């Protein structure tokens, strides 16, 4: 049996997780935030984590998951989705698991359209990424199915580790300058889907609109 724990904000990582799961036999999907709310001992022999890259690193909630998840699988894989660069994300995942005497057997990255406000991708590039994604995810899934091991190649070295951290801090500083997130009242129909699907539970509804 196999399980893929995923975190997805815009849908890229959920799409990747579903694509990989379809290629594996008897594989189920579980949300990382759901697991953290109700943790249990994972019995599956194959455990995967699929998540986006945030500021060239793993999202804090994924970091917390890797520090807390109860598991002793035979094979662990980590797949990250990104707009341009994965930074230190794979090496970070490897190190977090190593600290718990667990081994990240396989790590991979796949480029998909990003939602960066600071560095938005041109439309032509986004369309190209979407065309290439099925083949890239298919290869990743086959590698996982065949228990491919690239443990020795997951470290990015000094430049990626500390350069990624510096770049991430710079991006976060730019994001803070955009101010508070608000809803476009003339376009919002009050469906509540944003509150339902937000993986971190950061959106609440008030009077039929997302509360600010």
Give the residues covered by each predicted segment.
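Non-catalytic alpha-helical scaffold/packing segments enriched in small hydrophobic residues
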Residues: 136-139, 193, 197
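Generic non-transmembrane alpha-helix signal with a bias for helix starts/N-cap capping motifs
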Residues: 90, 190-191
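FMN-binding flavodoxin-like domain, especially the glycine-rich phosphate-binding loop
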Residues: 2-4, 8-173
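Ferredoxin-like iron-sulfur electron-transfer modules
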Residues: 168-190, 196-197, 201-212
């Amino acid at each position: 049996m196999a399980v893929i724990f995923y975190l997805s904000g815009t849908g890229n990582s959920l799409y990747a997780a579903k694509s990989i799961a379809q290629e594996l036999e008897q594989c189920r999907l579980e949300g990382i935030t759901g697991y953290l709310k109700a943790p249990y001992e994972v019995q599956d022999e194959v455990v995967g984590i699929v998540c986006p890259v945030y500021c060239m690193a793993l999202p804090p909630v994924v970091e917390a998951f890797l520090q807390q998840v109860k598991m002793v699988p035979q094979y662990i894989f980590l797949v990250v989705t990104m707009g341009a660069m994965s930074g230190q994300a794979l090496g970070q995942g490897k190190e977090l698991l190593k600290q718990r005497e667990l081994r990240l057997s396989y790590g991979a990255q796949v480029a998909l359209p990003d939602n960066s406000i600071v560095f938005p991708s041109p439309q032509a590039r986004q369309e190209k990424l979407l065309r290439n994604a099925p083949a890239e995810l298919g290869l990743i899934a086959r590698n996982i199915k065949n228990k491919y091991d690239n443990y020795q190649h997951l470290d990015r070295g000094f430049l990626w580790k500390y350069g990624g951290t510096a770049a991430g801090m710079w991006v976060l500083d730019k994001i803070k300058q955009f101010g508070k997130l608000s809803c476009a009242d003339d376009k919002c129909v009050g469906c509540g889907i944003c509150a339902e699907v937000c993986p971190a539970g950061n959106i609440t509804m008030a009077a039929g609109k997302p509360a600010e």
